[in-house]
Amino acid sequence: SDLVTPERFKAQVFHKRFMLLTKVIDDLLEPLLYYHFDFNLYENGQNIALSNMLFACFPLAVGHAYFDQFLSVYYDMCGEKSDEAITAFYEHLEVMKEAAAQSTLPMEWELEVLSMTSEIVRDALQDLPKSTFNPAIPAFFSLCVEWGRQHVRFDAICDDSEPLERQADFFTAIAELKEQAEEQQVIGFGNAQIELPLRLNTLAFSASHDSDGIQLTDVLTSALSYYYTKRQKGETNDEFFMKLDGLGFLHDFVSGCVWPTTDVTPEALGRGGDEGGHNPANAFADFLMERNR
């Protein structure tokens, strides 16, 4: 339909396995390097470059099965936060080291650095919320930023989502910061910049069967999910995938994504010149503290 355009529909796409790996880097490795070695992994987007490199190389060095299990035991560790789960994660890293030692692609150093995170893992896990792996919250936040670039104010209606409903007060509070300033402030760096306060006017929740807009969004989102899942698996000969691919404009609906690429240079990542190593979370916290003074 001519009514379905990027001006009316926007989507955030998450590669879940890659997102898990980025969480390992951001939640475990980054604090170890920063607090123990005074090294800023966010400088020039090195955290993203490392995530891209490891996602491509780990399966080649240790095998896809060991890599998938690595992501699985990390997920379990973050959910359970128990001594048993922590032990299972670091024991699996030892198994990966043994496999890497037999590989023509040397990755022992990278695995050894990950093993060193055992020094800070309990502190890191303590700070992780239960929703840490749920993409709904960062996706909604990013969509609010995108719609705010298109509209002075807007209302949001979301389907019944427990993680989002639990954060409703947070999003409303960020939007209400407009009362403290007429102009938005840009935080972050390069292609990770966002504008705050959010231009969100109201936030409401509705069952999908009560909202035509949510039902239409569900259909479009399902099509995108199918398309990118098949693309991720390399199943590009699938009949429905080819029909979707033949449309030629699905990518136009994606306003942002967490997806692996082969980009490893600051310029390719859109972070060239970010010598300060801007951490989006820290920039956001600084913004809130400044407004609350």
Task: Name what the model sees in each region.
Residues 1-293:
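Phosphate-ester processing/binding pockets and catalytic centers
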